[in-house]
Each structure stands twice: as structure tokens, then as C-alpha cells.
């Protein structure tokens, strides 16, 4: 049985035709389950492949070849990655020979480099910690590789797991912030902020023309201020997001978000403000006994199939509130035109209900919060918050489904320099 991908050239040439595994070792491992057997066989395979590579360099044992340019140097204790842990093994050593037959230095075995690489351990550490496994519980949550192997294993201590998690999440951060976005057919952009231990992390989510959701960036700051938002959007544009055909941008009620969007995208962005946030803000300015009735009227105005009729209803409600609750009226009027952008684009049904609020990006943010819920002590470094946030965003991406209500003829883009009252679709979902 070949225990390696034959397309892996680094290993394929060293895989032995046969493999000897001691019956005693297999029998002991069988008592601990199939994975323990696999680990026992895997260690034997790794050793056999390394010996095969040493034979290819040095020739057979006791060959006494005067033309050889490498010789064996015994073995040395080291470790390889098996079953999500580091397990001890004795690696053969090979030395290069100079023209006089003298040792010129040790030669690294390519096969050992593959077996010893720690990328798998980093991924295991990140996935388990994002799933809520604490560093102190990591050893108990490790794969059942057998009592003998577990006793000899390393890399499961709190400090080792923590180091690997930092490495893995830093890689996730680099992946998120380094993505080439030029290939995305961006139709919708959502922006919102998530609090990480007193600091605001502004995140961005793109929905492509086929309904795929893609987290595209994050920026750390004290609040959702214009500077942070503008820097985030400028970075997204620099990495290739094409908005030349227009972009629907969905945000909550924060003025800084709208200001940042307009400063970067200008007239090529149509802003849809979150209707749920608007209703919540207006209700917050009303006495408890008046909230339900007024919220029902506002909800009805937002749901009107004719956006201009809905806008008139909302303005009429604001005029009524001027007399009794002027603060609620002011809250309602702020950004009111932007509440009907999706309706003006001719989008209705489930897709419209999805795009008139920020629930989609808030769901992603909720996963970020869940993955970091076990953190008991946030250090002062901004890097820690950015790493956790990036890892949470990529974890959320794995759980995404395509946009609900997506249909082939639903317009989400508009012609250049559109008016707010009339948007002409140029790209279809």
C-alpha cells in the first residue's frame, strides 16, 4: 500500500515498495483504536521513507563505494507530526563528502522536512481553540493516538498551543488582508463594527453577483470613525474591488460609515441604511406605551412596495412626532432617504428583506464574538484583537450559505452617477 500521494515528488521517489511494522507494536496499538494503529504505521512509514532517502544518497549499507559523495552519520532523536501531535523518532543523519572524502557538513533530508513541518499543528490549534477548547484542556481534547504515543507526545502544553495559535491566527490575518479582490464580481458591500475588549474592529463583507459572501477586510480603531472606515475602504479598493459599475452599500445608522463610503466611492455607491437599526433608534426615543403602535406604522412604511409612497408615509409620521416626541422625529428623519434604496432598485421579496438590514454581516460578527468568548485576558496589543477577529471572520466564511432570495434577474448595481430616485440596473444577480 502506498501511503503517500504519488504526485508529491518530494516523497514519491523515496516510498519503499514494502513496509515492516512490528507485530507487537500493532497489537499494542489495536487496543487503543484504529487511529492509534494508523499512528504506529505512520511512524514506521516515516522512518522507512527517511531510510530510503538515506540509501539513495549514501548507497546500501557496507557498500564501500569509493565514488560516493555522501555517508551516513548515525541517527539523532527528533520528532515528526502524527495525529495532530509531535511524536519522537530517530532520524538518520547524512553527511556530504568533499573531494578528499572528508565530511563537508550534514545534509537535510527532504522527507524529514515534510514530516516535521508544523502547519498541521498550527491548523489544529486554531480550529480547536476557535471551537472553544481552552489551552489547559488541549491535551484532553487531543486525538486518541494510543497511550504509548500520547505519553511520548509533545506540543500539547499550554505554552506550545498558545504559540501555535498565535502563528496560525497571524497567518489567517495575513490571508484576509492580503486577498486579491480583483476577481470578485462585487454587487453588495456591507460594513459594520465589532467590539473587541474596548476597541472597535470595523469589518467588511462583499456579496458577489452569484450570492457568495466573502469577508474582505478589517480595521482596528477606537470607534466607527470616518478615518478608520475610509482606510478600510481604500485598502479594499487597492486590492482590486471593482466598483466602476456601481455598488450597493448596506450600513447601520452610523454617520461615519456613510461619510467614509461617499468619500471613497462617490456617486458610484448607493447606500441602504439598516431599517432594523432605524426602527430601534426611533423606539429608543419613545415612551414604552407608544412604541409598538408607532413601530408598526414605521414598519409598514418601510415595507410599502412603492418606495416613494413609503417615504411619504415615513415623513408624515415624523411630522406627527414633531409635536409630541421631537427627538424621535429627528432620529427618524436622519438618513431617511437611504432607507428605500433597495426598493428603488426594484428588488423585492426575500432578497429585499435580506438587503434592507445588516443582519448578514452581524451574523458574521456574532461568530467572531463566539470564537473569542473564551478569552479571559486581552493584552494591550492591537495585534491580538486583529488576529482573533480575522480568525473569526474566516471561520464564519466556512459556515456561509449563498444569499437567500437570490434570483437571476435581481438588479443590485446601477449606471454611473445615478439619481437617488431612479436607478438603472446594468448587472444582474
Language-model-detected regions and their locations in the chain:
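Conserved beta-strand -> loop -> alpha-helix junction used to position metal-binding or nucleic-acid-contacting
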Residues: 218, 248-255, 260-299
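Acidic/histidine-rich catalytic cores and adjacent linkers
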Residues: 1-10, 15-29, 41, 47, ...
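Alpha-helix N-cap/N′ positions at the starts of helices
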Residues: 117-121, 293
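Short, charged amphipathic recognition helices of the HTH superfamily
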Residues: 132-144
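Short, amphipathic alpha-helical "recognition" segments used to contact nucleic acids or chromatin
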Residues: 120-132
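RNase H-like nuclease fold core
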Residues: 23, 56, 62-63, 70-75, ...
